[in-house]
A protein has these predicted regions:
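Internal, well-folded beta-alpha domain core
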Residues: 103-139
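A basic- and aromatic-enriched beta-loop-alpha substructure that forms the phosphate/nucleotide-
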Residues: 56-112
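Generic preference for well-ordered secondary structure
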Residues: 2-6, 47, 51, 78, ...
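N-terminal ordered "arm"
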Residues: 2-55
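Phosphate-binding glycine-rich loops and adjacent basic patches that engage nucleotide phosphates
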Residues: 24-25, 84, 88, 121, ...
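Alpha-helical context
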Residues: 1-2, 39, 43, 74, ...
């Protein structure tokens, strides 16, 4: 079995990140380490496959629809705020939150209550930062 880490490189957009989530889902639920980055790292890692992902509206809409339907609007809004943040590993955060919520033995709509989980905690912090920045911009 191949346990090589997969690094998905995508554009810095919600559509690009959600397409990468769609592509990386099958590896992530099998326990393979998957990272989603918005730009190529300066130092490449050994034993990693770097895969460029092109945005696909249909795949991104499927991911968004699944989040809204199975996890609710609060989780969807939170993940959209994370996608709008300037954090470089925001794609990985979104993927890991979804794997924990929808994967085998997932907690579903209560995922945002798992504050001790580092990915959920960081997602909520990024949501707050982006929300404050947005409301500071609009006055």
């Amino acid at each position: 079995m191949n346990y090589e880490k997969k690094v998905l490189l995508c554009p810095d957009s919600q559509e690009g990140i959600f397409t990468s989530v769609y592509e990386g889902w099958s590896w992530a639920v099998k326990g393979i380490d998957v990272a989603i980055l918005i730009k190529e790292p300066e130092n490449l890692e050994l034993f990693c496959s770097y895969i460029n992902i092109s945005p696909d509206l249909e795949k991104a809409q499927k991911v968004a629809g699944t989040i809204r339907k199975r996890l609710g609007w609060y989780v969807y809004e939170t993940l959209c705020y994370v996608a709008a943040s300037g954090y470089e590993e925001k794609g990985t955060i979104i993927l890991q939150v979804l794997v924990q919520a929808l994967g085998k033995g997932g907690c579903g709509r209560q995922i945002m209550d798992k504050l001790t989980d580092p990915y959920v905690n960081l997602a909520l912090k990024l949501r707050t930062r982006v929300w404050h920045e947005l409301h500071r911009y609009y006055g």
